[in-house]
């Protein structure tokens, strides 16, 4: 996810928070990754009551390895940054589905995931 405490990221995180039990029942855990610091993540977790871990990838190594760092458009301008992407990974560590940036509906993202895994 791109950034702690922004409207889209907050909506997405809260959707996942609210559906954590349903996702766990299907065998899925939730991890968030952004380039924000661990301190920023902790504040975000506390402010939103998040019930899952956030990884601080401040040098973007993991984001780049996942293909979730690259060129995007923001406010009509091209920039380099985090590409909002979700990977569904099974118990064997195999990616079974990828939600590309334009496919993610932040407010309803947990429902999108549940529809795929049901």
Regions found by a protein language model. Give the residues of each.
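Chalcogenol-based redox active-site neighborhoods
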Residues: 1-118
């Amino acid at each position: 996810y791109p950034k702690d405490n922004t409207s889209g990221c907050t909506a997405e995180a809260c959707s996942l928070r609210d559906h954590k039990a349903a996702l766990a029942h299907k065998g899925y855990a939730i991890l968030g990754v952004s380039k924000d610091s661990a301190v920023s993540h902790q504040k975000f977790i506390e402010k939103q009551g998040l019930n899952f871990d956030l990884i601080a990838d401040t040098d973007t190594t993991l984001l780049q390895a996942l293909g979730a760092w690259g060129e995007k458009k923001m406010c009509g301008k091209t920039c380099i940054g985090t590409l909002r992407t979700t990977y569904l990974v099974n118990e064997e560590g195999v990616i079974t589905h990828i939600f590309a940036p334009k496919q993610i509906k932040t407010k309803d993202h947990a429902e999108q995931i549940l529809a795929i895994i049901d």
